[in-house]
UniProtKB/Swiss-Prot annotation:
Family: Belongs to the Mediator complex subunit 17 family.
Protein name (record): Mediator of RNA polymerase II transcription subunit 17
Role of this protein: Component of the Mediator complex, a coactivator involved in the regulated transcription of nearly all RNA polymerase II-dependent genes. Mediator functions as a bridge to convey information from gene-specific regulatory proteins to the basal RNA polymerase II transcription machinery. Mediator is recruited to promoters by direct interactions with regulatory proteins and serves as a scaffold for the assembly of a functional preinitiation complex with RNA polymerase II and the general transcription factors.
Tagged with keyword Cell cycle: no
Domain of life: Eukaryota
Composition skew (Low complexity), residue ranges: 62-74
Any one Gene Ontology molecular-function term assigned to this protein's record: transcription coregulator activity
Transmembrane intervals: none
Oligomeric and partner information: Component of the Mediator complex, which is composed of MED1, MED4, MED6, MED7, MED8, MED9, MED10, MED11, MED12, MED13, MED13L, MED14, MED15, MED16, MED17, MED18, MED19, MED20, MED21, MED22, MED23, MED24, MED25, MED26, MED27, MED29, MED30, MED31, CCNC, CDK8 and CDC2L6/CDK11. The MED12, MED13, CCNC and CDK8 subunits form a distinct module termed the CDK8 module. Mediator containing the CDK8 module is less active than Mediator lacking this module in supporting transcriptional activation.
Length: 651
């Protein structure tokens, strides 16, 4: 067996976990391994802080070694054996280094505490700088303390003064920087609002709306220059700016589009250059640079010129029954007969002569700001259409191009259908339609207001809708009598005001179309007010218990009305003794007749045919009532008094 070569066998435990117990059936119960925190707590429990540090033990061991060096050789051999055992002996306390560091830190903290207590409490020790010169023998220690305090206060005061000087310098420098803004910072602010590019040694900007879809040929270029008109050695004004812009001469000043509607058209020979500039020049906003206001005004002038150029081009191209007239900076159109629409470009430059000419030719302000605002909206919509004319292909694999080109194929449109799809109204046509609608709406409102102020009975009320369109508005017209609003609700009209006509919708759904003439609307409203009186008598008769014998909105008897037709109604009392006949016309007015019983008529001649007394209960002829002498605030109130007087007493 001794000659057999040794074989190394690695023995490993079958289970790393310790076995707690083994059951009768052979099952083993294991102990769960300790977690990191539990293992750390177990090791900390083994530390004995009562023992000395390792450094002290080493020093003691070193002293013993020195003592043993003086001993014999036998003792030195034993010592080497013991040192060998110590070298291979593992450390029993793994946290010895932590304990040593904590003890050294505690020692240093104690020393620091002692030093601070000595410095704070002068009873222990006084710290003074070392002086080279010997102190005089008669100098008092209190004098030295006073001198040291003065020196320390002087040093602190010097530090505070230096800090105050630095703060004042920084504040003054910031104020000077605000006043003396450099060219580069202003150029950076300018680039944040406007498009700039460098061409050679010049910096050019763009005022046009080409990026928004404008096709106006004006270049709209301005140049950025450095302001050198001020002497920097002198006092700099507050509004000084080192940057200035130079715009084209035709874009200087301010401009706006003046749109007005006049009833009488002047002679064509009197038309000329319109100079009706009344608006003040735009003022710069507080905090904004002057070049911003200057560029905004120039861009507004460019936009107004583009609008007027587009309108002039369309005025020449559009074929209408009454041709449009373009004279210098004015466009004349006639939307309705005896009505003139004037669109003028008013441009005021910064010359001194322009205010004088403006004051000489001032006229009453009839400018329609709504149409001017709509012109700006329309030109922006035109720009948007120009940008979106090239649409993305659907599907994505199709080539780029216009939509009508992609629709060609088996289901392609013919030429007429494509023209109908592509046909769109121009800027001038849209603004003329809006002007027609505005004029028709104002004429309708004036007609209703004039009737309401002129006629007190019946009352006419107009409720305008807040939600309108640029081409259509609606107003609800109510005709009522004062004090009888609950029973007199028969006349309710809805007026839909369009571009060239007015649609009237009655309460029962009937629709009547009126033209743009104001007299036609006035006649219609007068006839409706006349019918209202008859309808009010009908509703009052139902409330009073009278019987309606006849009713007609269009009476064919009597005088012919020049406006509409007359209405009539006949009602009888509850017992049938009395009858009231009412005839009301838009022009002739109201006529009321009362029929009495025969036995109350003294003027009737005796008849030889009607001898029986029963015929006396029949009603006699009608007698007209002097309506002007009746008491009452309105027509319905007078009619109520008349019916009450003729009704039988039930007591």
């Amino acid at each position: 067996m001794s000659g057999v070569r040794a074989v190394r066998i690695s023995i490993e435990s079958a289970c790393e976990k310790q076995v707690q117990e083994v059951g009768l059936d052979g099952t083993e119960t294991y102990l769960q391994p300790l977690s990191m925190s539990q293992n750390l707590a177990r090791l900390a429990q083994r530390i004995d802080f009562s023992q000395g540090s390792g450094s002290e033990e080493e020093e003691a061991a070193g002293a013993e070694g020195d003592a043993q060096d003086w001993a014999g050789a036998g003792s030195s051999a034993d010592q080497d054996d013991e040192e060998g055992l110590v070298k291979f002996q593992p450390s029993l306390w793994p946290w010895d280094s932590v304990r040593n560091n904590l003890r050294s830190a505690l020692t240093e903290m104690c020393v620091l505490y002692d030093v601070l207590s000595i410095v704070r409490d002068k009873k222990f020790m006084t710290l003074d700088p070392v002086s080279q010169d010997a102190l005089p023998p008669k100098q008092n220690p209190q004098t030295l303390q006073l001198i040291s305090k003065k020196k320390s206060l002087a040093g602190a005061a010097q530090i505070l003064l230096k800090g105050a000087e630095r703060l004042t310098k920084s504040v003054t420098e910031n104020q000077e920087n605000k006043l003396q803004r450099d060219f580069n910072s202003e150029l950076l602010r300018l680039r944040q609002h406007w498009k700039l590019r460098k061409v050679g040694d010049k910096i050019l900007g763009d005022l046009s709306y080409r990026s928004a879809g404008s096709l106006f040929p004006h270049h709209g270029t301005f140049e950025v220059i450095k302001n050198t008109d001020i002497d920097l050695d002198k006092k700099i004004p507050e509004d000084y700016c080192p940057l200035d812009v130079q715009i084209p001469s035709d874009l200087e000043g301010s401009a706006y589009i003046r749109v007005s509607i006049q009833k009488q058209a002047p002679d064509i020979g009197d038309l000329g250059t319109v100079n009706l500039f009344k608006r003040p020049l735009p003022k710069s906003k507080p905090g904004s640079p002057h070049w911003q206001t200057k560029l905004e005004a120039a861009q507004n002038v460019l936009l107004c010129k583009e609008i007027f150029a587009q309108l002039s081009r369309e005025a020449v191209q559009i074929k209408s029954q009454i041709p449009h007239i373009v004279v210098k900076n004015q466009i004349i159109s006639q939307p309705f007969p005896s009505l003139q629409l004037s669109i003028s470009l008013c441009h005021s430059s910064n010359d001194k002569k322009s205010p004088k000419s403006a004051t000489e030719k001032q006229s009453p302000e009839d400018h329609l700001y709504v149409l001017e605002h709509n012109l700006h909206l329309l030109i922006r919509e035109f720009h948007k259409q120009t940008l979106s004319s090239i649409m993305m292909p659907h599907p994505a694999s199709a080539p780029f191009g216009h939509k009508r080109m992609r629709l060609s194929g088996p289901q392609a449109f013919d030429k007429n259908e494509i023209n109908s799809i592509q046909s769109s109204e121009g800027l001038l046509e849209k603004i003329i339609k809006q002007a027609k609608h505005i004029f028709l709406r104002s004429r309708t409102a004036a007609t209703i207001d004039s009737l309401a102020s002129r006629i007190e009975d019946p009352q006419i009320q107009a409720h305008w809708s807040n939600i309108n369109d640029v081409y259509e508005s609606s107003v609800k017209v109510l005709i009522t009598s004062q004090g009888y609003e609950q029973i007199c609700k028969s006349i309710q009209l809805q007026l839909n005001i369009g571009v060239e006509q007015i649609r009237v919708v009655h309460r029962d759904g009937r629709v009547i179309t009126l033209s743009h003439e104001g007299q036609e609307l006035q006649d219609f409203l007068l006839s409706q007010m006349s019918q209202h009186q008859v309808h009010a008598v009908q509703q009052l008769a139902k409330v009073m218990g009278w019987q309606v014998l006849s009713f007609s909105n269009h009476v064919g008897l009597g005088p012919v009305e020049s406006i509409g037709n007359a209405s009539a109604i006949t009602v009888a009392s509850p017992n049938g003794d009395y009858a009231i006949s009412v005839r009301n016309g838009p022009e002739s007015g109201s006529k009321i007749m009362v029929q009495f019983p025969r036995n109350q008529c003294k003027d009737l001649p005796k008849s030889d045919v009607l001898q029986d007394s029963k015929w006396n209960h029949l009603r006699g002829p009608f007698k007209e009532v002097q309506w002007n002498k009746m008491e009452g605030r309105n027509f319905v109130y007078k009619m109520e008094l008349l019916m009450s007087a003729l009704s039988p007493c039930l007591l």
